[in-house]
C-alpha cells in the first residue's frame, strides 16, 4: 500500500509541474500592470520601478519562472502583492474557511444524494423515481449564485423571525471572537495549530464552547447547502443509474429467485457494487466545490480560497494565483489517491498492484 501511494505521488509531480507552468504563463498573459493594480493612484514611474525590482517583474520571463520553481521546492510560495504578506500565511488564514465549507457541502451532497439515488433506483418508474429525476435535473440546472440568493431571501429575510431563520452571512456573529485552542490549552503556537484554529467548528469543539459551535454551524448551513446542491444532484443521478444497472445483473436476479426480500437484495448484494462509479463522482465533485466556492464565498461574505483567488486574478497578484492553484491541484491529487484506495476496499477485483 505504501509503495502504491508513493508511486502515485511521484507520478503526480509532472502534473503539478505542468499546472505550475500553466498558471505562471496564463497569469502573465492577463492584460494589465501588477504595479498599477497594487498601487493604483500611487503608481508613479519611480514607484513602479521599485515595485517591479522588489518582486522580480523586471527580470526575463524565464528567470522569473526559474526563481519561482526554486522557491516552491524550498517551501516558499512568495509574497502577496496586494496583501503584503506571504502566500503561506494567506493559505493558513483562508484555506480553513474553504475547507470547512467544502467538507460540509460534500457531506450534505453524499448524505442526501446517495439515499435519494438508492430510493429512486429501487423504485424505478414510480412517482418517487420521477420526482428524484426532476429534482436532480433542476439542481444541476440552477446556478450556484442564483440558489445562494434565493436561500438568503427565503431564510434570512422572509423567515428571519421564525425558528427556521438563518443568518445571511457565512461569518460568525459580530462580537463572537473565539480564542484559539492552543491559547486555551496553553501550548505553543505553530502554523499547523493556527490552521486548525481557523476552522471555526473544530476550534469551538477543542475549546469546549458549544455556543460558538452552534453559531458557526448556523452561519455555515446556507452557504454549504448552496454549494452542495449541484454535486448532490449529480451523485443522486449517478447512484440511481448505477443501481439500475446492477439490479439487472444475473447474481441479483439469482438472489431474488432465492426469495430474499427486496431490501436485502439491494443493501447486501446490489448497493456495494453500484457505489463504485459513485465514489469516482464524489472525488470529482471537489472540482465543482472549488469552482462554486468563488461565488458562494463572495455572496456569503466568506474570505476563503475562492474569494481570495478571484481578488488575486482581478488584481494580478501572480504569487497568490500560483500558490493557491498549486495547493488546490495538490488537493486534487490527494483526493484522487484516496478515491483509488477506496476502490480497492469496495471491489475485491481491484488490486493495489
Predicted regions and their residues:
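Alpha-helical transmembrane segments of integral membrane proteins
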Residues: 2-3, 95-128, 144, 177-353
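Short alpha-helical functional segments enriched in proximate histidine and acidic residues
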Residues: 12, 72, 98, 102, ...
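Short, membrane-interfacial amphipathic segments enriched in basic
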Residues: 1-2, 58-63, 76-88, 121-124, ...
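An internal, D/E-rich "acidic patch" concept
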Residues: 36, 58-114
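N-terminal signal-anchor/first transmembrane alpha helix
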Residues: 1-60, 88-92, 119, 127-145, ...
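Hydrophobic alpha-helical transmembrane segments of membrane transport/permease proteins
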Residues: 15-66, 155-212
Amino acid at each position: 500500500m505504501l509503495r502504491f501511494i508513493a508511486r502515485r505521488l511521484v507520478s503526480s509531480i509532472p502534473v503539478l509541474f505542468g499546472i505550475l507552468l500553466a498558471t505562471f504563463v496564463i497569469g502573465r498573459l492577463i492584460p494589465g500592470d501588477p504595479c498599477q493594480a497594487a498601487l493604483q493612484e500611487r503608481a508613479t514611474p519611480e514607484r513602479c520601478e521599485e515595485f517591479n525590482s522588489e518582486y522580480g517583474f523586471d527580470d526575463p520571463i524565464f528567470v522569473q519562472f526559474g526563481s519561482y520553481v526554486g522557491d516552491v521546492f524550498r517551501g516558499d510560495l512568495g509574497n502577496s502583492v496586494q496583501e503584503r504578506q506571504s502566500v503561506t500565511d494567506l493559505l493558513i488564514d483562508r484555506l480553513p474557511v474553504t475547507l470547512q465549507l467544502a467538507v460540509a457541502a460534500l457531506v450534505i451532497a453524499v448524505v442526501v444524494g446517495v439515499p435519494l439515488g438508492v430510493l429512486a433506483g429501487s423504485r424505478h418508474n414510480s412517482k418517487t423515481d420521477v420526482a428524484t429525476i426532476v429534482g436532480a435535473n433542476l439542481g444541476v440546472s440552477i446556478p450556484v449564485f442564483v440558489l445562494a440568493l434565493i436561500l438568503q431571501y427565503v431564510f434570512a429575510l422572509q423567515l428571519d423571525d421564525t425558528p427556521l431563520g438563518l443568518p445571511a452571512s457565512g461569518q460568525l456573529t459580530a462580537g463572537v471572537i473565539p480564542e484559539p485552542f492552543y491559547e486555551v490549552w496553553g501550548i505553543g503556537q505553530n502554523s499547523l495549530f493556527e490552521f486548525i484554529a481557523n476552522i471555526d467548528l473544530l476550534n469551538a469543539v477543542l475549546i469546549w464552547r458549544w455556543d460558538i459551535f452552534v453559531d458557526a454551524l448556523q452561519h455555515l448551513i446556507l452557504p454549504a447547502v448552496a454549494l452542495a446542491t449541484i454535486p448532490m444532484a449529480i451523485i443522486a443521478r449517478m447512484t440511481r443509474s448505477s443501481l439500475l444497472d446492477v439490479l439487472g445483473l444475473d447474481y441479483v436476479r439469482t438472489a431474488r429467485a432465492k426469495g430474499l426480500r427486496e431490501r436485502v437484495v439491494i443493501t447486501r448484494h446490489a448497493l456495494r457494487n453500484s457505489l463504485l462509479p459513485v465514489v469516482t463522482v464524489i472525488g470529482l465533485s471537489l472540482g465543482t466545490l472549488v469552482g462554486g466556492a468563488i461565488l458562494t464565498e463572495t455572496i456569503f461574505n466568506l474570505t476563503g480560497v475562492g474569494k481570495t483567488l478571484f481578488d488575486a486574478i482581478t488584481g494580478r497578484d501572480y504569487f497568490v494565483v500560483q500558490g493557491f492553484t498549486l495547493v488546490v491541484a495538490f488537493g486534487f491529487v490527494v483526493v484522487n489517491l484516496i478515491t483509488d484506495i477506496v476502490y480497492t476496499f469496495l471491489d475485491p477485483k481491484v488490486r493495489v498492484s
